[in-house]
């Protein structure tokens, strides 16, 4: 009887705020208490192999989940914070079940039609946020592998779009591809250096 009074809660997290290229990804997950999943720690603490295994388990066992994106064009038009909030709103709206409460990793919550709470380091403290963290990170890593196939000069499969020395050198040498975030200062600076050498 007590379970009838439990609130339906979704955990939400994002991946890809810091990279210089590719979309920002958000995931929302409502876990099924009758189908527990072990090891739902923050995705950054797990090996890629373990994350991949957990990704499949979450999709198989969750009561509901949705993975959503905000594109590079949206990031450049809105700014990365607003694009992240948009991706989160899309992930929550895409759930097949409407939660009564949404728990979000971090210190900000998007505008939502239900109660929400931002939880700093929530990916390590709240199981459903940990699950969302894994879905978002694995989905984005797979997108970066596809980006690498389309734009092999930049090494997206290795650095996942982050501003490594090799990535910045490739930006100077080859210019930006359509998936680079042109409003990000390292991209602008690399393109300015490339133009100066032209």
Swiss-Prot record:
Its cofactor is Mn(2+); Mg(2+). It is found in: Cytoplasm. A divalent metal cation binds at residues 13-14, 105. PROSITE patterns: RNASE_H_2 (PS51975). The keyword Signal does not apply. GO terms for cellular component: cytoplasm; ribonuclease H2 complex. This is Ribonuclease HII 1. It comes from Methylibium petroleiphilum (strain ATCC BAA-1232 / LMG 22953 / PM1).
